[in-house]
Amino acid sequence: NPQHAVLKGSKIIKGTWEKYKDDIMQIRTGQEISPYAQLYIDGIEMVLARYPNYDSTISHYNGYAADAIDPARVKHWKNPEGAIVHAMHRGEWGGFHYIVEDSNKKGKVTLSGGHQNNRPSPMHEEYRMVENVFEELDAPGEWYFDSSKSILYVYPYENMVLTNALVEYTALNHLIEIKGSSDDAISDINLKGLRFQHTNRTFMETYEPLLRSDWMIYRGAAVFLENTEDCNIMDCEFTNLGGNAIFASGYNRNLNIEGNHIYNCGASAVCFVGLPDAVRSPSYNYHEFIDFKEIDTTKGPKTRDYPVKCKVNNNLIHNIGLVEKQTAGVQISMAMNITVSHNSIYDVPRAGINISEGTWGGHIIEYNDVFNTVLASSDHGAFNSWGRDRFWHPDRKTMDQITKDNPMMPYLDAIQTTIIRNNRMRCDHGWDIDLDDGSSNYHLYNNLCLNGGIKLREGFYRTVENNIMLNNGFHPHVWFQNSGDVFIKNIVMTDHKDIRLQGWGKEVDYNLFPNMAALEQAKNNGTDEHSAF
């Protein structure tokens, strides 16, 4: 929109271009360009020199190679220090990012980083990419900055003329911060009709765990809000951002995010993340737990430092997570009563919408079109959630006993029911709707699932009714003996894909199957007495 006022976090490079060698050009900048910066020439994003070369048709890192940091390759780099390594989690549960600190004579590198994922693992053996290496400056569109000489090298695209071109590099992590104080919230700030672009990649900043979910997150974005009330972000464009686009941190009330176009971003589009101080008896890793005798059994949050009654409505979100892979179109953690409605979310590496834990529920996810999801990862959902709340324990036998003795404990954190209704969902490498570890107190109805079906894993009190699952069906995984789950009046296209159940919940019945064999198998499990095909 030519009417948009533009807010950029970039600086301009001016000078005279000279030939370096072959097709590579150079310019003396007199300015420092961070390896976490993004470079644009006449508005075209350039590619930091990398191996393997950039290929837009490849989902994982736009090109990957098992030998990205093999000693045989590293030995040919004059100065490996400062190279950036990106690698997927071995289970493809997001990714990691590292910096090469040093290398020995044999080409073995020493790395720092890898702190961006709350489920640590070795690097994926195949899905790896390395960048910021001068010797890998070998393809059109690539660039490299030599900080020791203050020289920028560019291998221009075909027909790209550098003389008099506008050369910009990002220099900021945030563009606007709206921050009140804990005792004096800032209110009634409206951002409308603005274009936000050009921020740094933030994957090596400080990350924090989102309780026991798989996520670590950088608490920052192009637009960052904290301690706000009744603010609006409307009809804006967010593009060419290295990290998150919008981040509501801690206390936020009645924030409205509506009618925005968010695309070409390195991390997540919209994040609602409360402060962990608001959580009772928090744990911060999958394997971490608090002894039951020491758990605070008071229901609900401890403070008010979390987002409440915020809306994400009628936004177009696509092509995000271009750098970081544990990302989402809308991310919710330690928040309550968030409404996500009428959004189109697609072309994302992981979930379109993610809820990290049960704290504190009451969300409404409705009328969203979420597709082309989990494109560069695995074992996830177009909608994904976890629920490793106070009742949850990494040892299943211990958790069985805790929940048997305290059947209402899942409601301590998931104090309100989260509703998922009237959505169209499609997942490429997982489930269309994935209520994973511990997700509790959900009501799913009137959803159209196009590819991956619906999965419910080891949680409590989920009701799933009147949904259509095309090309797939129902996936109940490792249910508790008395989970209280209900699965009724749904249309499925396969038999039930149960795994290690201790029981079949409160009710599984009145469903429509594709054929007699699938129905008979369900009846043999003691379910679907009144179902048909």
Task: Kindly give the residue locations of the regions a language model identified.
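Hydrophobic side chains in beta-strands
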Residues: 9, 41, 87, 102-103, ...
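Extracellular polysaccharide-degrading/modifying enzymes targeting complex plant/algal/animal polysaccharides
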Residues: 1-227, 232-239, 278-302, 533
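Extended interaction regions within the primary functional domain
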Residues: 134, 158, 173-179, 397, ...
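Short intrinsically disordered coil segments
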Residues: 14, 168-170, 330, 398-401, ...
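Right-handed parallel beta-helix
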Residues: 187-198, 229-243, 252-267, 276-298, ...
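Glycine-rich beta-solenoid repeat tracts in large extracellular/virion proteins
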Residues: 5-10, 88, 174-183, 203-204, ...
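Glycine/Thr-rich phosphate-binding loops of Rossmann-like dinucleotide-binding domains
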Residues: 119, 280, 393, 521-522
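Aromatic- and carboxylate-lined catalytic core of secreted/periplasmic carbohydrate-active enzymes
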Residues: 44, 55, 509-510, 514-533
